[in-house]
Amino acid sequence: MKLFTDETLLEIYNFLEQELANTSTLSFLANNPDTNPNALSIKSWADLAEIFKCKLQTPKIAGNQIEITFKKLNQDNSFHNANISDKTEKYGVDSLFFNIDKNNHPYFLHSFIQALKLANVAKREHILNLGINKADEFKLIKELLSQEEFSQLKLTGIDHSKTAIEYAKKQFPHPNTTFITQDINKLRELNLPKQDLIISIGTMQSPSINYKPLLMQLVQEHLKQNSAIILGFPNSRWIENTLIYGAKTKNYNFSEMGILLNDIIFAKKYLQQKKYKVFISGREYLFLTAYRQ
């Protein structure tokens, strides 16, 4: 079994790249960072596993060494590759996506909590979520607020998946929550009241959405004068329910962020023109949070 002692990170990287090209599981020994302050940390090994789209197995400790195992993720086991005849149910209850809980990922949870605090969610009476799916965002809001604060809100969730909406209704049978099956491109047909806060996580970049016109429509027609908006931009992929940093692009085998950053910059500039104060944060999901007073 390979033993790493004083190799450089580049040497380790090259070894992993070569070996993982021909095997799905790779084990090796390395210095124990608990006993050797110069050894690579467990976080560094976890980062390397993610780079090579592997899952880091729990290391085995053997005195001054640890045994590390990388297990390749099955990249075909991803909702991104799902072949579904009914496009409205790509994210429905029978989809791979439906089993994902973004709120259980530490960086997503941390970034979303910060965005909700910036938006002062407790004071936003009318809240609209576009692409609500099974209502994970409403679940977090409910957990963050007191029962009295949550009961004062009027929350509306919209999704084109009928099965997801039916599931969300069962999870939130509260009188202050409404769930609607609708194509977001046809939002005007619902004649909704203007909102204090709009949230959309990973929906605005869908191929079926005309992003820039829809964003302008939301600001001009669906937000109140003193309002807030939270947009979540995926900078990652889900493989086997594991969140892997970096969104895949069609023509490259690495993450190319040009389109993502272009969308964020457009939103930032447009919202600033409309006198919103804008913040950008996050990692695997980049959050744009804006509010206007």
Question: Where are each of the predicted segments found?
Answer:
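N-terminal accessory interaction module
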Residues: 1-86
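Class I SAM-dependent methyltransferase Rossmann-like catalytic core
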Residues: 59-122
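Conserved beta-strand signature within the Rossmann-like core of class I S-adenosyl-L-methionine
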Residues: 226-235
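Conserved Class I S-adenosyl-L-methionine
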Residues: 242-268
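Conserved SAM-binding loop of SAM-dependent methyltransferases across substrates and taxa
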Residues: 134-150
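Conserved SAM/SAH-binding beta-strand->alpha-helix loop
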Residues: 161-162
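A short, conserved alpha-helix within the catalytic core of class I
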Residues: 206-218
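A short acidic, Gly/Pro-enriched loop at the edge of an enzyme's catalytic core
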Residues: 189-198
